[in-house]
């Protein structure tokens, strides 16, 4: 039964397609961040949110891997000792299949790629803040009649310090979530406005060049604001914008950015789908798993529809066997598992501890190797015992009782004044040798012959070692 459910579960888990992020621009937008500082703050929060979710997924997969190793060690150890492992073990183990690792690796790579874009945009928004500046006036003095010999005094640039970065906009006071990521991010275009302003007497009257006080003032500005419009004339009372243009910092397209945000959101959702093996909902809520419970635990046909009383029975079986909370699952599965003894390699020797004391990947990996080796040895020893004694042992002979029931290769012996049916090892050996001779003879007659001999041990080890390497 355990093998059957394990096989069905593995088929189900491997049939699940890998979850990948897709790209499609959102239709709803957040409130626009109107300044570079606000946009940089928004991207910073978005970056930290993504990093936190990636770290959670990596940690979850890492812990799942350790739990899977423990489950496999416990399963092999129980099997080697003649016991049975519950169907929960098989399912939880299968849930740590390569498909889950593929989901993590693929979507983590997508997220890291998108984070590179976010970090680059954030840096450029801050860069715009650092180049936002206004020059002090460059002046041209009057020389009495005209300006051709008037003196020019050069001004300098002063970086504009903003205080808006000390606070957040209402849109960005809350932490981002999946709803936030399902929208366009409302990011301001990365442009830098350049303006050249001209004034006569700095708005103090007409300029006749009659005296050195009749100055023409020229000012340069760079910032992220609207570039404004140029004036057709220079009014003596106002500063006129003589030149204005936008400098495009990068050639980003808003639809491309929005599509990237969608891919980012989908990749994060895919990471969230990695199950937490300490939560019973990771498997009891799975429709395919419930179908398996109905088939294997309740002996229902695989085509049984899970409705009504059948579904109620399945839900009760899930609750009884696996619990409905992490604490119940711990009591029913993890605590007994952690109490099991496991042998592992350490400092060139084999040590034995409870599974709960094995915390490193090296300890768990070597413990799995030891468990596999022991399981193979037990199987081979059992096979040799069967071949040697013709499938009979002292225990099976004793169970037959005395008298006519005690037949070769068993025989009656007297121990402590009582008759017992015990295995006659010489007779058992003769029976086994005769069986081998008969098998060889059948082979010469064209019938099936077992030619593996001692090689069967190596043949049996191959799939086990492959399973060990693929874990």
Swiss-Prot record:
Glycans are attached at residues 130, 220, 260, 450. It is found in: Cell membrane. Residues 455-471 form a propeptide. It comes from the Eukaryota. Keywords: Cell membrane, Disulfide bond, Glycoprotein, GPI-anchor, Lipoprotein, Membrane, Signal, Trypanosomiasis. A lipid is attached at residue 454 (GPI-anchor amidated serine). Residues 214-226 have a biased composition (Basic and acidic residues). It is a lipid-anchor; GPI-anchor. The keyword Cell membrane applies. Residues 158-168 have a biased composition (Polar residues). Disulfide bonds join 397-410, 406-421. GO terms for cellular component: plasma membrane; side of membrane. The keyword Disulfide bond applies. Residues 158-183, 204-232, 432-454 are annotated as: Disordered. VSG forms a coat on the surface of the parasite. The trypanosome evades the immune response of the host by expressing a series of antigenically distinct VSGs from an estimated 1000 VSG genes. This is Variant surface glycoprotein ILTAT 1.1BC. It comes from Trypanosoma brucei brucei. The lineage of its organism: Eukaryota, Discoba, Euglenozoa, Kinetoplastea, Metakinetoplastina.
